[in-house]
Amino acid sequence: MNYTQRPKSRRTAGYKAPKTEKPAPKGETKTDAGEKDEKPARKKQNIFMKLRNAIFPVKGDSVTESVRKIVFDIAVVALVITGGSLLADVFDRWYQVNIVDAKVEEAYDPEVETIEGVVNLSDEKKEEILNEKPSILPSFMELYAQNSDIVGWISVGEADDYVINLPVMQSEDNDYYLTRNFERKETKSGAVFADFRNSFENGNLSANTVLYGHNIWDQNLGGSGMFAKLTRYYDATINGDYDNRLDFYKKNPTVTFNTLYEKSEWKVFACVLFNTQEEYGVVYPYTQVHDFDTKEAFNSYILDIMDRSVLWTDVDLTYGDEILTLSTCYYPFGKKVDTRCAVFARKVRDGESAEVDVSKAQINKNPLKFTYQANVEGGEWKGRTWDTSKLLSY
């Protein structure tokens, strides 16, 4: 026996060797290593949770981060609302131009001159309309059957290239058709409508018939655009449509305005930019005058209009003439300055030719302006310089 050799240990049945701890990694204590093993594994967030936490304030966000998220959320909501509103406007205009206007135009044929020519109404309906309006023109019967508020039809331009070609409505106030179309449905486009104070019964018109229409032209949508292109009488070079300010007038010197009882042509003689706010200068009440009790009242009105007109024509006027006023909104100085563009026409007299010598038309370079307009555009009014002999009753 080698007494220097360590004796072998004896193990009995069931004996278990004591566990030995692994040394902690370098730089960690045993306590640190143990705590690290005891931490549960983090659950991975799905993409929706991450997106929610990135957009909306959550517990643990700093004040600055919460404010940033709130501002961002408000901006997104505003963008969605604005975008939805713009899309609604585009659809509204598209529907008005391509559906409503087209359907109404199809129902109106000014060439229909006999009751028999009205093919889309039953005999009973025709008789009913004639009992209500004995003198109605056959061409208006179908439209009248659809909406009895119709009082006429306004057209500017040739049949194959209309600038305006729309029915004219009238209600008990000037608000109803401001936001309703021929079908009486709500729309931002509204309809062309006559001032509620104007008379149309049995073809007896007021001395000054005033028609209103929105300025909503959108060349991408096509169609009429209500009264938007009336502003071309004020300045034909708007949007580069024409090279000369007079070009639009020379192409469209007359307006067709047929009532339920009579067809008629009207000669354009003036175009004026009117102010509607006293803070910017004189507010001339051009839409408030519908009848003239005296020759002096008529002359005074025409003188006031011609002094302000940017357009001089060869059309003469006299007391007893019927006047047509077409009015639309127009903002050459921005919407802060609420202005209107109005075109004035005189009814072609019995036996008179509807022809106009457009070669004699001129641009008035120095019209009477309201205060704000004069300050922006410059130019001092030098008094009445137009040919007053054109006002025969003056």
Give residue spans per PLM region:
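Acidic/proline-rich low-complexity IDRs
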Residues: 50, 78-79, 120
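N-terminal targeting leaders characterized by basic, low-complexity, disordered sequences
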Residues: 1-52
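Juxtamembrane low-complexity tails/linkers enriched in Ser/Thr-Pro and polybasic
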Residues: 52-64
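Extended hydrophobic/Leu-rich segments
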Residues: 48-51, 55, 126-129
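Solvent-exposed, non-transmembrane regions of membrane-associated and secreted proteins
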Residues: 82-394
